[in-house]
């Protein structure tokens, strides 16, 4: 943020509304410890909780969706952990499992996109669903091709869903 030094941008209060000072304070500017952020693309009058709540694709709603999925899928919270071999050096692959469900996690930890082939022969014929948005995938086959954006990840539910655990 232009004009803010060190860690000051991290200490700036969250903007709640497009109101004066982001709805955080009605104090006049000289009494504020840090000014509200007005940099293009980050202006508190545009980027604030009130506006973000209304935008389905906002970062706020994306995080809410991710936390909802985690809450609804017990395997992501307390399932067993099994590290899988990754054919791509920048992609971490692992499983989180309970007796009733298996979640496959792929996380690209690099600044470049990653393409890889996954061996799903262990789950051939199982129903497969992308967790965050609930998109059904073709039944698991021996091999899947996956593309992940830079620092991207995906969660797939493999097999049957526990009752009441459908995040879509």
Regions picked out by a protein language model, each given a short descriptive name:
Residues 1-168:
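Carbohydrate-interacting/catalytic domains
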């Amino acid at each position: 943020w232009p004009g803010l030094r060190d860690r000051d941008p991290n200490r700036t209060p969250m903007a709640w509304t497009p109101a004066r000072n982001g709805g955080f304070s009605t104090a006049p500017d000289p009494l504020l410890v840090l000014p509200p952020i007005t940099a293009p693309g980050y202006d508190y009058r545009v980027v604030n909780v009130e506006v973000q709540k209304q935008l389905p694709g906002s970062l706020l709603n994306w995080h809410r969706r991710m936390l909802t999925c985690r809450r609804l899928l017990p395997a992501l919270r307390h399932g067993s952990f099994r590290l899988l071999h990754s054919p791509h050096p920048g992609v971490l692959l692992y499983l989180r499992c309970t007796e009733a469900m298996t979640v496959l996690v792929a996380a690209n930890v690099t600044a470049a996109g990653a393409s890889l082939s996954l061996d799903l022969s262990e789950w051939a014929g199982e129903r497969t669903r992308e967790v965050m948005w609930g998109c059904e995938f073709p039944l698991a086959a021996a091999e899947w091709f996956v593309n992940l954006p830079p620092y991207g990840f995906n969660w797939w539910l493999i097999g049957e869903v526990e009752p009441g655990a459908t995040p879509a």
